[in-house]
């Protein structure tokens, strides 16, 4: 088992299981929240750039 920082006691199996469960929950949170938010921001940026350039093209044609 791993040595806990600043403590003489080593990590127990129960502590290891709880730590792994917390890591798994954190990973699931990233997958379900952070990635879709980043994707939405990226899509909005692309839509903004496309709309800004298409407006500019209309003026250039006249």
Swiss-Prot record:
It is found in: Membrane. Belongs to the SMCO4 family. It holds the Pfam family DUF4519. Residues 1-27 are annotated as: Disordered. Residues 9-31 form a coiled coil. Keywords: Coiled coil, Membrane, Transmembrane, Transmembrane helix. The chain crosses the membrane at residues 30-50. This is Single-pass membrane and coiled-coil domain-containing protein 4 homolog. It comes from Nematostella vectensis (Starlet sea anemone). It is a single-pass membrane protein. GO terms for cellular component: membrane. The keyword Membrane applies.
């Amino acid at each position: 088992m791993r040595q806990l920082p600043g403590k003489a006691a080593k990590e127990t199996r129960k502590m290891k299981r709880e730590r792994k469960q917390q890591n798994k929950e954190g990973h699931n949170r990233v997958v379900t929240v952070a990635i879709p938010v980043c994707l939405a921001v990226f899509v909005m940026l692309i839509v903004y750039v496309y709309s800004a350039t298409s407006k500019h093209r209309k003026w250039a044609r006249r």
